[in-house]
Amino acid sequence: MYSILVCDDEKDIVSALKIYLMADGYQVFEAYNGKEALEVLKEQDIHLVLMDIM
């Protein structure tokens, strides 16, 4: 199973993406800032990161 990290400060965006990705069979991790994202990346084997750069 592929794992995806969704990182965005907008919780609604993260929730919506998580719903769609999980429905397609992906394991989804959440982060709401860069520090949280780095912690997830240290602890999990992540295949793809989706993030808002703005």
Regions found by a protein language model. Name each.
Residues 30-48:
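Acidic, metal-coordinating helix/loop segments flanking the phosphotransfer/catalytic sites
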Residues 10, 53-54:
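The short loop immediately C-terminal to the conserved phospho-acceptor aspartate in CheY-like receiver
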Residues 6, 50:
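Walker B beta-strand of ABC/ABC-like P-loop ATPase nucleotide-binding domains
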Residues 11-29:
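Two-component/phosphorelay signaling modules centered on CheY-like receiver
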Residues 8, 25, 45:
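Conserved functional loop/turn residues at catalytic and ligand-binding sites
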Residues 1-5:
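Non-catalytic signal-transmission and effector/linker regions of two-component phosphorelay proteins
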